[in-house]
Every structure is written in C-alpha cells, then in structure tokens.
Swiss-Prot record:
Keyword Transferase recorded: yes
Gene3D superfamilies associated with the record: Aldolase class I
Main location: cytoplasm
Keyword Cytoplasm: yes
Organism per entry: Trichlorobacter lovleyi (strain ATCC BAA-1151 / DSM 17278 / SZ) (Geobacter lovleyi)
Localization in the cell: Cytoplasm
InterPro entries per record: Aldolase_TIM, DAHP1/KDSA, KDO8P_synthase
Annotated pathway: Carbohydrate biosynthesis; 3-deoxy-D-manno-octulosonate biosynthesis; 3-deoxy-D-manno-octulosonate from D-ribulose 5-phosphate: step 2/3; Bacterial outer membrane biogenesis; lipopolysaccharide biosynthesis
Assigned EC number: 2.5.1.55
Protein name: 2-dehydro-3-deoxyphosphooctonate aldolase
GO CC annotations on file: cytoplasm
Record-linked HAMAP family: KDO8P_synth
GO molecular function: 3-deoxy-8-phosphooctulonate synthase activity
Length: 272
C-alpha cells in the first residue's frame, strides 16, 4: 500500500478512492479556466470523486516557437489562486526552473516536475525543499525502475510528499506506448502513482508544428491502469477540444467525462 498524502481537502494513496487530476492543458484565460474548474467540480461532486485541478501557466516545451504557451507565471498563478480560493479545490501546475519554485509554492498545492525535466536534480531538490507535494512525471526516456533515484532525490531533501506519474515511453518516432508493468514497479517505492491518460496517447510532434493524439485509446489504457491499483488518474479535458490552444487531439471532451469516470470508478471499487 502506498503512503497517504493530504493535498488540501483531498486524500491520495493509502488505499483511498481514485483521485482525478484534470483541467485544460494550458490556461487559456481566467474566464475559461474558472468555467472548466466549476464544471469539473460539479462532475466530481456528483460522482463522489476527489478532484485536483490542473492547468499550466507556461507550456515551455511546445513543438513550435509559434505555439501558444499560456499567460506566464505571474498571471497564471493569480488565476490558479482564484480557482483555489473561489472553489476550494487544490491546484497543480508545472514548474520549469528553480526561479519559479518559490512563487509557485505560495499558490500551488502540488508542484509538478515535467517529464522532460525529471532528471534535473537542482529543480527536483528545490521543489522538494518547499515541503509541498511534488508530482514527478516519468520521462519518456526512463524505465520505471529509474524513478527510484528520483524518489531518492526528493526524500533525501526531507520531503516524502511524493507522487509519481506515468505518461508513456517513447516508441519509435512520434509515438508513445504504456508499459503496464510500470505501475506496480513505481508503487513498490511506497508513494502514490498516477496515470496520465491523455499525454500517454499523444503523438509528439506528429503534426509537424504540433503534437497529434489518439484520444480514442484513452479509456482502454485508463481501464487497464486502474485495474493495476493506481492511486490517481490524470486527464486533460476541454469543453471543445477542437478549439483548445494546446493538446486538443488528446484532450477529453468535458461532456464525455462523467460516463468515463463512472466506468473507471467501478473498476477501482473492484481492485481497492
């Protein structure tokens, strides 16, 4: 069994109910962010599912220089603070440099280390030293057992509030595959493990100047991951993915989310 973490009002791990981490890929505007957060809260309250809202203030690893990156740290944190205060739900976002750690920690309940940066010791240690929950996404280039060393970096910094997230492994060019063995391997380190269901079906750079995606496989992979006993599911969602400013091809339409979550909850109840 994994360690139980307290994230605002949400409990994750330790045999608790499956937690949803969800939101638009990037903060598109204050109005859109609050609207998505309110809809997600309504959906999760109706299902009795714990929710952590996520959205990025800066997508620093977009495929093209012309791609929308978000409002930036200052404005993004202001918007996420408003979500947190007005709706009372925990919030998560990515950090990309040591300089971002302190201001982000003043607002965020979870500091997320992006997959491409999971080996950056100084960033991981700086995040850990805040005492905040740190969600480290497993790099597409790492084996699941390599995450033991990442866990060691966080724990050695005096922080055991750790989440590990699987988001697929590189499988040739412009493709990812999910190795289901990664879930029991990473859970064996004693901390909650999350499946990033939407980034795992991404086709990185697959559309030339942007990434493609195969959202039709999200449910299949999510069901398999939940059946292994994971602690949380991570999904990027949008009210209209065709108009999303980031990762639309692999985002889940909000209208389809309740039925999908209900099916995943049923599986979670069996394996709990």
């Amino acid at each position: 069994m994994t360690k139980e973490l307290s994230i605002g009002s949400v409990k994750m791990g330790g045999g608790r109910l499956l937690v949803l981490i969800a939101g638009p890929c990037v903060i598109e505007s204050e109005e859109a962010t609050l609207r998505h957060a309110e809809r997600l809260m309504t959906i999760c309250n109706g299902l009795g599912m714990p929710l952590i809202f996520k959205s990025s203030y800066d997508k620093a690893n977009r495929t093209s220089i012309n791609a929308f990156r978000g409002p930036g740290m200052d404005e993004g944190l202001r918007i996420l603070s408003k979500v947190k205060e007005s709706l009372g739900i925990p919030v998560l976002s990515d950090i990309h440099s040591i300089e971002q750690v302190a201001p982000a920690a003043q607002v965020l309940d979870v500091l997320q280390i992006p997959a491409f940066l999971c080996r950056q010791t100084d960033l991981v240690v700086a995040a850990a030293k805040t005492g905040k929950v740190v969600n480290v996404k497993k790099g597409q280039f790492l084996a699941p057992w390599d995450m033991r060393n990442v866990v060691g970096k966080v724990a050695a910094s005096g922080n055991e509030n750790i989440i590990l997230t699987e988001r697929g492994a590189s499988f040739g060019y412009n493709n990812l595959v999910v190795d289901m063995r990664s879930f029991p391997v990473m859970r064996s380190y004693g901390y909650p493990v999350v499946f990033d269901a939407t980034h795992s079906v991404q086709l990185p750079g697959g559309q030339g100047e942007s990434s493609g995606g195969q959202r039709e496989f999200v449910e299949t992979l999510s069901r398999a991951a939940v059946a292994t006993g994971i602690d949380g599911i991570f999904m990027e969602v949008h009210e209209d993915p065709s108009c999303a400013l980031c990762d639309g091809p692999n985002s889940i339409p909000l209208a389809e989310l309740p039925a999908l979550l209900k099916r995943l909850q049923a599986l979670d109840a069996v394996v709990r």
